[in-house]
Amino acid sequence: MARGTFERTKKLREESINAEPHISIERAVLMTEAYKKYEGSVEIPVLRALSFKHYIENRTLSINDGELIVGEKGDSPNGAPTYPEICCHTMEDLEVMHNRDIINFSVSEEARKIHKEEIIPFWKKRQTRDKIINAMTPEWLAAYEAGMFTEFMEQRAPGHTVCGDTIYKKGFLDLKKDIEARLKELDFLNDLDAYNKKADLEAMAIACDAMVILGKRYAEKARQMAEEETDEAKKKDLLLIAETCDVVPAHKPETYHQAIQMYWFVHIGVTTELNIWDAFTPGRLDQHLNPFYERDVENGILDRDRAQELLECLWVKFNNQPAPPKVGITLKESSTYTDFANINTGGINPDGQDGVNEVSYIILDVMDEMKLIQPSSNVQISKKTPQKFLKRACEISRKGWGQPAFYNTEAIVQELMEAGKTIEDARLGGTSGCVETGCFGKEAYVLTGYMNIPKILELTLNNGYDPISKKQIGIETGDPRNFQSYEELFEAFKKQLHYMIDIKIEGNAVIENICAKHMPCPLMSTIVDDCIEKGKDYQRGGARYNTRYIQGVGIGTITDSLTAIKYNVFDKKKFDMDTLLKALDANFEGYEAILNLVSNKTPKYGNDDDYADEIMQEIFNAYYNEVTGRPTVCGGEYRVDMLPTTCHIYFGEIMGASPNGRLCAKPVSEGISPEKGGDTNGPTAVIKSCAKMDHIKTGGTLLNQRFAPSVVQGEKGLDNMANLVRAYFNMDGHHIQFNVFDKNVLLEAQKNPQDYKDLIVRVAGYSDHFNNLSRTLQDEIIGRTEQTF
């Protein structure tokens, strides 16, 4: 059955989900032309801006039949541009993208020819990917290749940020005036950075020009199409598009329709300027749109149906944009088409009052009706949120496709204030990507990569030696067979952790400098607060707040592993360290009795058992203390968050067996969720265990829970879901999300994938088509503990 409330959006949705993801070579060609023309003659920020402007002036424009919101990243829906200045793919990369079984991108023969003859020769030695790898120390490279951590900027650009309200108050002509005024104020006598500021500001002004051109070109194209159109209804739509593009993005929006189109033009601009990770995000969309909605309804030019239709059109636009193609380790850490555009709904308003409004409910209806993996939608639940809103969100969630996710507004505000933000800015913040918090429109909060915490224990148990890569990756902290206490083991673990965090942050500092020098983003700098005022590009610390995150992975696995060692080796003395190490080396073959002890007769995290939960707290605090507060190149600080995307699969693949009974190469635990099968006391025990982590010290945590459909059916099931969310959030939990499915359905989908093309599940901080997941990830989701109330 076609989904969509209106015939228009039913058609657009079907076209979107059936469009083949493909490589769009056009951006690479136009950027190459611009670099050949301008490189060496202007400062790099201006080079970036002129290249972006050249791209905007010459790129293909797409207005798809029936749509009301216009703009694509590629040449057509599901076209993925490439970014050779950041990552110049090899011909082998293109072959892999074209032929791999999942997350594949069609690459035409023409695109391959152009890439081989024009793109690779120019960009091979210019790409930042090579600059980064070549600048890394042998220790960093060894740790990276061993899977101790990942690096987001290896194929993507920093730029994880969220849209604030600037674009709804000012058009790009207004922003250009602000930039020109700031240029006149530069003090070259007393400000040693004035020359760099001049280049940054001039680049921002050029980026504003480019955005004005983008709107003008779309207005002209829509009018041209209207002149040729014989269908009166379609002609009317095209003229409306033209009138809308006459206003935005050059000027501030005046209507609900214009506000949506304004955001979308900015989204397309920011995500084609650089392939930022994660994609640019609307943030508090209901808060931004509601004033336009109320005014238009009052003026009689908008009703609820039309407002929903326009948002359904926007949902299709998000779904038309696959994440930039990835290869190698970067694909393993985020194996999905989704680019993590995340919409926050609900929460509180700037005055601290309930933020739920009519647009909030419209957004819930849109996500329910459209059922698309992009955008990823969440609800912020505060103590002031109406129960009606929470239950409507739960009603959608229990349908089984993983949206919306649930976030604790009070926790988000406290997390941001803990990190030094003002309460006014914190109230306007929220979550993006998977679960990460930030002050929307005011903060550059860049994810730098995942940290494999269980593998740090693996190094500790092998005196710094990695049994998988057969290399000395860590430092020598002693033979664990000689440790006389659990405390001695944990001290050794903390030393390995300190060493690995040092390596990671040392590399990050180099990468930040490379990106600031070679990959400024003048367009994004125009819309992030304080960049214009400071005269500094986003990449140089122009934003009001500059945060860097290192995401911890596998807290459930390492908690149960250290618990197993403390309980069985040191406290109960059921076996010694030497026997355990031999069992791990043998993948427990021949050591089934030990496997049974650690798997079934040892305290586990996720059961409200203080024995295990206190160890979780120790591990978390060690990680927090190592990372949080370290300075960044841009004048901000490092923080931690706890999420995996799909990295828990990769991290497990490059590990041997773990002391908790996890077998060699099997996934480690995801988010802050307990190890699969370890949580046996129900969902209330799970949230009690998870709440013992101090979420307020983080920038986000991710908790998955799984139910069978029968458990959450009816009014009682709905109340149980809502009450679980409220209970967890009353304990300061950050986030919870639900998978609701029949295990047998997923097993059948593995056997007959052609019959389950529309099956969607929750993976980590996002939902995805079951058929787009690797078999290992499918098995991991199927194996998650099925909870009952």
UniProtKB/Swiss-Prot annotation:
Top EC class, one word: lyase
Residue numbers of Glycine radical PTMs: 765
Highest rank taxon of the organism: Bacteria
E.C. no: 4.2.1.172
Domain Glycine radical: 670-789
Keyword hit for Isomerase: no
InterPro entries reported for this sequence: Gly_radical (IPR001150), Glycl_HYPD (IPR050012), GRE (IPR051215), PFL_dom (IPR004184)
Catalytic activity of the protein: trans-4-hydroxy-L-proline = (S)-1-pyrroline-5-carboxylate + H2O + H(+)
MF terms in GO: carbon-oxygen lyase activity
PANTHER family on file: DEHYDRATASE YBIW-RELATED, FORMATE ACETYLTRANSFERASE 3-RELATED
Designated name of the protein: Trans-4-hydroxy-L-proline dehydratase
